[in-house]
UniProtKB/Swiss-Prot annotation:
It comes from Histophilus somni (strain 129Pt). One of its GO terms (molecular function) is ATP binding. It is an enzyme of class 3 (hydrolase). It comes from the Bacteria. This is 5-oxoprolinase subunit A. Belongs to the LamB/PxpA family.
Length: 247
């Protein structure tokens, strides 16, 4: 049976966390520097444990004002300290809750910049490996970040998006554009099935680009996140595709 992971961003101050954890197989737990706090992180970890959902850390630039979505240029040593701080916090709360932090997925601008910047990708990979070499790194399918992570000996998870539109180079349409988001569940389902079954994703210029789909992301702060997750699970099941983090 074909398998796919379904992941969601949590502990970002949204009301959907508990509902989504009944529908997904992996949870990207906010580390407190773009949103959330220690209590929301703790609750998200416990809820994930209750639902047998795999837990990953979701670190960002220190940018609460812009939800971590603004590009920043930090000195390498400062950014490493920022990442160690965030990963250490989530790992400690996971340890205290009797669960394992299994992977890392950068957030927002950090994610998008590292997808194209080899130096930034290497800094992230080195930091993650220093925390725990068994951690996997989740990133945009086909991105430089995943290639660099593998060069550093890390296992990787190729991520695709149900609720984002794509450019011809395989990158995401910037959120500053009006056509960045997939706004209805019918389009999201069509895009997901094409990615999982055909290994391609439609682009905004009318073409298609090849991708590898290990994990599908839904944004927990999205207005349609719960609706998307329910439909996606149902449609995947009907196609004989198992939603699981065991990939």
């Amino acid at each position: 049976m074909k398998q796919i992971d379904l992941n969601v961003d949590l502990a970002e101050g949204c009301a959907n966390d508990q509902q989504l954890l009944q529908l997904v197989s992996s949870a990207n737990v906010c580390c407190g520097l773009h949103a959330g706090d220690y209590n929301e992180i703790r609750k998200a970890i416990l809820w994930a444990k209750e639902n047998d959902v795999r837990i990953g850390a979701h670190p960002s630039f220190p940018d609460r004002e812009n939800f971590g979505r603004t590009n920043m240029q930090l000195p390498d040593d400062e950014l490493k300290a920022c990442l160690f701080y965030q990963l250490g916090a989530v790992k400690a709360l996971c340890d205290a809750s009797g669960v394992t932090m299994e992977y890392v997925k950068p957030h927002g601008a950090l994610y998008n910049m590292a997808a194209k910047d080899p130096h930034l990708a290497a800094l992230i990979a080195e930091t993650v490996k220093s925390v725990d070499p068994s951690l996997k790194l989740m990133g945009l399918s086909g991105s430089i970040m995943l290639t660099v992570a593998e060069q550093h000996g890390l296992a990787t998870i190729s991520e695709v998006f149900a609720d984002r539109h794509y450019l011809a180079d395989g990158s995401l349409v910037p959120r500053t554009r009006d056509d960045a988001m997939v706004e209805n569940d019918e389009e999201a389902i069509s895009q997901v099935l094409q990615m999982v079954l055909e290994g391609t994703v439609p682009t905004v210029d009318g073409g298609n680009v090849a991708i590898k789909a290990d994990s599908i992301c839904l944004h927990g702060d999205g207005e349609h996140a719960v609706v998307f997750a329910k439909r996606i699970r149902r449609e995947l099941k009907e196609k004989g595709i198992l939603v699981t983090s065991s990939i």
